[in-house]
Amino acid sequence: VGTGAHYGDDLFAEVARYAMAAARRVAGKKYDLVHAHDWMTFPAGVEIAQRAGAPLLVHVHSLEYDRAGHGADRDIVAIEHQGLEYATRVIAVSYYTRGLINRVHSTPLDKISVVHNGVYARETVQAYTEQRTSSGPVVLFLGRVTFQKGPEYFVQAAARVLEHIPDAVFIMAGSGDMLPRMQALVEDLGITESFRFPGWLRGAEIERAFSTADVYVMPSVSEPFGIAPLEAMSYDRPVIVSKQSGVSEVLRNALKVDFWDVDKMASQIVAILELPELRRTIIERAREEIRHIHWDAAAEKLVPVYESVLRG
């Protein structure tokens, strides 16, 4: 959660430098297939594939369009396009992303395979409930506080929820360029006392956030997949997810909402918090569902894609 990496003073120079360094590192070696993940490795993937005479498979976890919408960086979009054009096969993390790749880059749909992400099984759950600092129900947003993640819609929905459940507490955990605006919006709406902004969480802090929340909300504007809802479900937490997300394709036991429909989002939050039977049913069914959404299943789906590329 948040942005902690530093890629150098010139990101594009770093991407080009990495491509050349990677190509030198593997010079003279033979490969059957090259698999590159997202735009920062696409130039390296293309360079290595050309030198090795091997097919290139590019894996799209997100597009620049997801992160920036119509304000997308043209240079990043150009690098994405180069990788997608050169690749023998493209893998998208969802049908949502598959469609977006087709619309933004005109990549043929029959060139794009879909392999959904998964989540690691959790053997134990640390108990943090005794550490709750609020007597009211807790609603969690955990992610980058950026345009893509829809934080403004979470705040707007929170204001509506508080009209029905005044003691509810909303946690916006994460950092990003929209954080100051969200803090100002919370103040303008007069709901400062009901909001917490703990910043960028790590490790046990993330576990504590999931464990002490009563519901997790992912209101993303454009989410290629979205692993956080699966993580929340692994903590037996009911989740509400944007329909504009890949994870909504694989989840049956989650409430779904268009990111812009803050009235419905608020109604769903209220329903989960005020209807114990609904909450219990969602948790019990999701507990079984999450067992089948794991990384081993994703890996198994990759095998026939590899085989297809290698057969030519």
Label for each model-derived stretch:
Residues 1-28:
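A conserved catalytic-core segment of Leloir-type glycosyltransferases
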Residues 91, 132-158:
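Conserved donor-binding/catalytic core segment of Leloir-type glycosyltransferases
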Residues 254-263, 271-276:
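Conserved acidic donor-binding segment of nucleotide-sugar-dependent glycosyltransferases
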Residues 221:
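Aromatic "clamp/platform" in nucleotide-sugar-dependent glycosyltransferases that forms part
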Residues 96, 118:
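Carbohydrate-associated surface elements
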